Amino acid sequence: MRGLRVASMAVATVAALILVAACGQSGPGGSSSGLASRTISAGSVEITIEPLRLDTSGASFQVKLDTHSGDLNMDVARAAHLEVGGTDWGSASWVGDPPGGHHREGELRFASAGSARGEIRLTISDLPGPVLATWNIASG
């Protein structure tokens, strides 16, 4: 009986580890960057940022903005700034919902400005609070 209980616990532990590992993976159409998404509260606005791609050809992030007070009238491309490994990656483009409303979603894209290694810092201004999402891609 004791052996059966130990075996059951071992199976449950392995199943839990597989579930945890699967939750960290992206499904079809998900992130190929290998970087985790970030959810940040900026005052009354909640922002979810998922890195989709970050390499020497450029960067793209799936961005969701949600609020229940006021409208999201900002120009997301103009409000965004990306720095990778200390290098400014310049201006962004936005392919997504137009200004207005309580919920917006789209893809924020940057052309490459160099190496896709080091600390990644994506800031978004023009919101009720500061938004800074960071990741790190090891050199080499």
What are these regions (language model features)?
Residues 1-13:
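Bacterial N-terminal signal peptides that target proteins for export
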Residues 18-22:
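C-terminal motif of bacterial Sec signal peptides marking the signal peptidase cleavage site
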Residues 24-27:
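Bacterial signal peptide processing site
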Residues 32-56:
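Low-complexity, acidic Ser/Thr/Pro/Gly-rich terminal tails and inter-domain linkers that flank the onset
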Residues 42-44, 56-60, 77-79, 103-105, ...:
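Extracytoplasmic
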Residues 50, 62-66, 109, 123-125:
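Residue-level recognition of well-ordered beta-strand positions that form the cores
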Residues 55-99:
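Mature extracytoplasmic domains of secretory-pathway proteins
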Residues 86-140:
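Short, solvent-exposed, Trp/other aromatic-anchored flexible loops in extracytoplasmic proteins
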